């Protein structure tokens, strides 16, 4: 009987692709987290969070989103907050390692020639580098989180007079939340109380930025010793789009909120510039906020929607459709406008298959955002721009909110739960599925050209 059981499990595992294993793993983490948060010991004294609150919080933590329906600082006990922290770390670290290992598993399904070509052109991870991947991810995670936690702990103790234990806990929690791009905070106003403190805002923002760039880029920068000539196309595209979108987000905040008394208007010039920088980084991937998002102008909301949807680097803790996906689409459009037969970036030609994959991910992402936004807007009393902001934030696993999440109906919140799960795992599993399911035909149909535009 044991032999039959082992063989059965082996057959079942053999029929599961790497994408399916990732989905099952994260679903199991959500279930475990929901059960733990549903225990009485997880609730703060005098608080009785509902099962929906436990499910929503667990999903948001595992998917490193940051959207909540109850205040993390008051609804959960120390044990409950510890569960949230553990789910964030497992979700963030697991996403980084599993997304990278998917490339390793994927390479087994490709021929040797293809693997060698891919390794030479992208310096991607090979089958013999699994140990190096795990050690590299662990080292980067530990260094960034410990450094950020140390700075925050010292600041909380010396300036805000928090006892050592409380300061250490707050420093560690927010450090993990920042690097994993979760955006969970242990203060009712998130980080608004620290809006004028660069010693809190800057370390957290830098941790978010490092985590959102993506682990493959970080490892390659370390290996190449910051020599651009050795960078792969993936690294170049990620850094290029980061260098473009950060100033764009900064200008969005400066132009849209400089005189808004509900956000930047009441601050001095230094405070305005600091918070514009913070909110240039956060919409890309994390849900921390140092100003009241609900008080932003609708135009700023719309621009933030775009930044959230694009997201951050691949194989990291960021959400969205990813920087490289957006970059491939931009260069494809530019090549078409110029009349170039090929899409060429940094003296490298982007294959038609990659272009199709990028288009599929982007269009499916648009569909995943538009459909729920229409449904929730039609069945709730909130405006379309508010609902769109929440939906994009959930899909892109950002966590910024206009403050309506807790007031939505339960089935609306369940839609957001599904969006968070889809947004976190969708780009990874979809990309893998598209690569694994490429079919080869022994014949080709005649070519035709319908009228476009």
Q: What spans do the regions from the language model cover?
A:
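Membrane-proximal intracellular helices of multi-pass ion channels
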Residues: 1-453
């Amino acid at each position: 009987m044991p032999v039959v059981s082992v063989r059965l499990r082996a057959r079942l595992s053999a029929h599961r692709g790497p994408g399916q294993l990732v989905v099952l793993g994260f679903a199991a983490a959500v279930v475990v987290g929901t059960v733990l948060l549903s225990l009485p010991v997880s609730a703060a004294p005098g608080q009785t969070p509902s099962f929906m609150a436990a499910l929503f919080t667990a999903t948001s933590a595992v998917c490193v989103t940051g959207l909540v329906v109850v205040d993390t600082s008051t609804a959960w006990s120390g044990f409950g907050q510890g569960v949230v922290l553990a789910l964030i770390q497992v979700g963030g670290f697991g996403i980084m390692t599993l997304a990278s290992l998917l490339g390793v598993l994927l390479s087994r399904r490709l021929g040797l020639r293809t693997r060698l070509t891919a390794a030479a052109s992208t310096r991607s991870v090979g089958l013999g580098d699994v140990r190096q991947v795990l050690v590299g991810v662990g080292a980067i995670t530990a260094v960034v989180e410990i450094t950020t936690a140390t700075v925050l702990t010292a600041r909380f103790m010396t300036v805000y007079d928090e006892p050592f234990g409380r300061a250490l806990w707050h420093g560690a929690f927010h450090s993990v939340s920042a690097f994993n791009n979760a955006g969970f905070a242990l203060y009712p106003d998130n980080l608004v109380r620290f809006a004028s403190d660069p010693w809190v805002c800057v370390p957290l923002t830098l941790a978010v930025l490092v985590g959102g760039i993506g682990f493959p880029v970080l490892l390659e920068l370390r290996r190449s010793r910051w020599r651009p000539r050795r960078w792969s196309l993936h690294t170049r595209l990620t850094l290029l789009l980061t260098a473009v979108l950060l100033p764009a987000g900064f200008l969005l905040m400066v132009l849209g909120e400089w005189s808004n008394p509900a956000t930047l208007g009441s601050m001095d010039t230094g405070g305005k510039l600091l918070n514009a920088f913070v909110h240039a980084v956060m919409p890309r991937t994390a849900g921390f906020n140092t100003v009241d998002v609900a008080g932003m102008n609708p135009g700023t909301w719309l621009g933030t929607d775009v930044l959230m949807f694009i997201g951050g680097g691949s194989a990291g803790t960021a959400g969205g459709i990813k920087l490289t996906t957006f970059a491939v689409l931009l260069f494809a459009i530019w090549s078409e406008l110029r009349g170039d037969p090929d899409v060429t970036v940094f003296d490298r030609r982007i294959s038609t298959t990659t272009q199709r994959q990028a288009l599929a991910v982007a269009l499916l992402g648009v569909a995943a955002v538009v459909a729920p936004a229409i449904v929730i807007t039609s069945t709730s009393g909130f405006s379309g721009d508010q609902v769109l902001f929440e939906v994009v934030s959930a899909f892109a696993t950002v966590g910024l909110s206009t403050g309506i999440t807790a007031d939505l109906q339960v089935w609306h919140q369940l839609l957001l739960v599904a969006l968070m799960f889809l947004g976190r795992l969708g780009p990874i599993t979809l990309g893998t599925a598209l690569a694994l399911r490429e079919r080869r035909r022994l014949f080709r149909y005649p070519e035709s050209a319908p009228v476009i535009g």
